[in-house]
Amino acid sequence: MSGGKYVDSEGHLYTVPIREQGNIYKPNNKAMAEEVNEKQVYDAHTKEIDLVNRDPKHLNDDVVKIDFEDVIAEPEGTHSFDGIWKASFTTFTVTKYWFYRLLSALFGIPMALIWGIYFAILSFLHIWAVVPCIKSFLIEIQCISRVYSIYVHTFCDPLFEAIGKIFSNIRINMQKEI
């Protein structure tokens, strides 16, 4: 019944009958088709973003976490006035915070665009150039490896076996004379 219309026992109309085994385009049966329709589809482009923990994989723990105490420190005996120290701390912290925000507002989206394009190109090249080249190389090198294997077993194995037998009979006796 290919190419025609098919009505199942419940009156649902199909253009192509759903076979028991199914195929790559249609689910195996009507029950599975309903399950597929009920499942939520998750798209990698629409996943939720965590606005609280913005570094869940801890990429920048040891690099960018710079606080006032990591940069400026006064050893014992050389302390400035407490007010100056507090003002310096506040100035450093607020400047770092707002200047980072300003830079990310100005350059964040263009840099995200640049890095997105870069990693898209990198992924494209890896998928469409690197992996096929490696697979092609592995296929081509199999022929060479078979020829090399025959060469080794034909010429090198007997040669080195003979050399091994020659040197296996060498005995060294060391005696210490007093």
Swiss-Prot record:
Alphabetized PROSITE patterns for the sequence: CAVEOLIN
Cross-link (Glycyl lysine isopeptide (Lys-Gly) (interchain with G-Cter in ubiquitin)): 5, 26, 30, 39, 47, 57
Entry GO MF terms: ATPase binding; identical protein binding; inward rectifier potassium channel inhibitor activity; nitric-oxide synthase binding; oxysterol binding; peptidase activator activity; protein heterodimerization activity; protein kinase binding
Chief place of localization: Golgi
Sites bearing N-acetylserine, chain numbering: 2
Modified residues (Phosphotyrosine): 6, 14, 25
Pfam families reported in the protein's UniProt record: Caveolin (PF01146)
Cytoplasmic-side positions: 2-104, 126-178
Lipidation (S-palmitoyl cysteine): 133, 143, 156
Intramembrane region ranges (chain numbering): 105-125
Region (Interacts with SPRY1, SPRY2, SPRY3 and SPRY4) residue spans: 131-142, 167-178
Gene Ontology, cellular component aspect: acrosomal membrane; caveola; caveolar macromolecular signaling complex; cell cortex; cilium; endoplasmic reticulum; endosome; focal adhesion
Region of interest called Required for homooligomerization, as start-end residue ranges on this chain: 2-94
Locations listed in the record: Golgi apparatus membrane; Cell membrane; Membrane, Caveola; Membrane raft
Bilayer topology: Peripheral membrane protein
Superkingdom of source: Eukaryota
Post-translational modification: Phosphorylated at Tyr-14 by ABL1 in response to oxidative stress.
Record keywords, A-Z: Acetylation, Cell membrane, Golgi apparatus, Isopeptide bond, Lipoprotein, Membrane, Palmitate, Phosphoprotein, Ubl conjugation
Function text: May act as a scaffolding protein within caveolar membranes. Forms a stable heterooligomeric complex with CAV2 that targets to lipid rafts and drives caveolae formation. Mediates the recruitment of CAVIN proteins (CAVIN1/2/3/4) to the caveolae. Interacts directly with G-protein alpha subunits and can functionally regulate their activity. Involved in the costimulatory signal essential for T-cell receptor (TCR)-mediated T-cell activation. Its binding to DPP4 induces T-cell proliferation and NF-kappa-B activation in a T-cell receptor/CD3-dependent manner.
Family: Belongs to the caveolin family.
Record's subunit section: Homooligomer. Interacts (via the N-terminus) with DPP4; the interaction is direct. Forms a stable heterooligomeric complex with CAV2 that targets to lipid rafts and drives caveolae formation. Interacts with PACSIN2; this interaction induces membrane tubulation. Interacts with BMX, BTK, CTNNB1, CDH1, GLIPR2, JUP, NOSTRIN, SNAP25 and STX1A. Interacts with SLC7A9. Interacts with TGFBR1. Interacts with CAVIN3 (via leucine-zipper domain) in a cholesterol-sensitive manner. Interacts with CAVIN1. Interacts with EHD2 in a cholesterol-dependent manner.
Name of this protein: Caveolin-1
